[in-house]
A protein has these predicted regions:
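N-terminal targeting/export leaders
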Residues: 1-111
């Protein structure tokens, strides 16, 4: 484990709802992100895992979280380029691939 970050709600309470662990060698290819959360509601859609850039504008989807835990490959150089904010969002089944704006929890990797 290279880094671990708590995933907390975005409201004022900042309740810890899960963790994200960066696996693999720091700065190397082949890193993975392991997500482990409490059960949560996806509403009528699904939960998607994102890496958001520190500029708050750019982001990349890592995939869909089915259940409460999963491991996702991290794109090469994503962390070095500032994609260190882990975000879980509720998404709808629609034809829009971008982030819905409905974040459930978030944490920033200390890398």
């Amino acid at each position: 484990v290279v880094a671990t970050v708590p995933l907390t709600t975005l409201d004022a309470s900042k309740q810890k709802e899960g963790t994200a662990e960066l696996l693999g060698n720091q700065g190397s290819q082949g890193q993975e992100l392991r997500i482990d959360t409490r059960p949560m509601s996806s509403g009528s859609g699904y939960v998607e895992v994102w890496l958001i850039n520190t500029d708050g504008k750019r982001m990349v989807s890592l995939g869909v979280l089915s259940g409460t835990e999963a491991t996702f490959p991290v794109p090469p150089d994503a962390l070095a380029q500032g994609y260190t904010i882990v975000d879980l969002s509720r998404e709808q089944y629609d034809d829009r691939p971008q982030h819905s704006g409905d974040s459930i929890m978030r944490g920033t990797l200390p890398v």
